[in-house]
Amino acid sequence: MCRLVKFASMFKNITIIGDGGMGSVLGMLLCRKGVATRIWGYDRRQLEEIAKNRENRKFLPGHKLPKELEFEHDDKRALTGVDLIVSAVPCQYMRQVWKRLRKHVSEDVPIVSVTKGIENDTLLRPSEILAEVLGFAQNEKVQTKHERLAVLSGPTIADELARKLPATACSASHDESLAKKIQHTFSDNVPWFRVYTNTDIVGVELAGAMKNVIAIAAGIIDGAGAGDNAKAALLTRGLAEIKRLGIKMGARPQTFSGLTGLGDLVTTCISPTGRNRSFGERIGGGQILEQAQSATESVVEGVATCKSVVSLAERYGVEMPITQAVYEVLFDNKPVQIAITDLMRRRLKAE
């Protein structure tokens, strides 16, 4: 029988799985407030380079990492003695990474995911991938064991967090005490980072994943020079699509009006440095999928997520014309102007 753990005020010893931009900036934030923090990376050479330079030049350039931040490639050492694990691995690589690490994960240690995406092969959310790989979903105690899982999501551009610019996020878990402890761990004595709590882990993860597809569409609008009116319409109707599917999948409607829904969508669609929007801008400017991907340093989660969302929309019978249009532009080579025209000429209806 799974033992329920009630959490105290803050976590003290944290390992971050993933050495990308978000993993690095969260390591910076935690070290600045005195939390013992280490980062594990899949690529030993890349991790050693980050440790040597005290800078993640590939994913978070221009920001020196604290000398207190540790780096560990050894699987067992990275996960020994920790009281919280942060999963910061791109969605399509999560299963591979956690299959490697699972034998070193203590059954009492909670895991918070900062990954945004939906797995292509299974259509699972990040917390569901963790539950499946770590064995949470193999018996009737699934719901109880899910109380070890949480999600931290919201409009959190890594470069801005590194510069201590004001930002907000949401800590979501079925276990409210875990959500609150994560909230205090990341927010207490950090005046530029405010974390709220939520128990709608389904809505928080779906909103964080699907907004990346709409961000690609926003970039396409920018690249094609379609104007601000078109972009405003895109964000509004894009959020409506996200909400429709989310509700069908069990999310709470109000989640999509909050930080992880509207908030994250706006930031991702307007930020000049956002990967998904910038990728879309290249597509709108005439590049094909492969060209735009090769020009982008980091993983563009919205590309893979687009495939997953189209499949989910079909499964749940939800109309998602913008997402479908993005899919056709990316994978069927549909010309951007024709895609825009087809969206504008859809059957007229009430809002």
Describe the role of every protein-language-model region.
Residues 5-8, 140-142:
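Acidic, Ala/Val/Gly-enriched low-complexity intrinsically disordered segments
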Residues 10-63, 70-73, 100:
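NAD(P)+-binding Rossmann beta1-loop-alpha1 motif at the extreme N-terminus of oxidoreductases
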Residues 65, 71, 75-80, 84-166, ...:
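Rossmann-like NAD(P)(H) cofactor-binding subdomain of soluble oxidoreductases
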Residues 80-81, 210, 262:
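Alpha-helix C-terminal capping/helix-to-coil transition sites in glycosyltransferase folds
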Residues 93, 104, 129, 136, ...:
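Internal alpha-helical scaffold of NAD(P)-dependent oxidoreductase catalytic cores
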Residues 218-222, 247-257, 261-351:
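NAD(P)-dependent Rossmann-like dehydrogenase/reductase catalytic/cofactor-binding core
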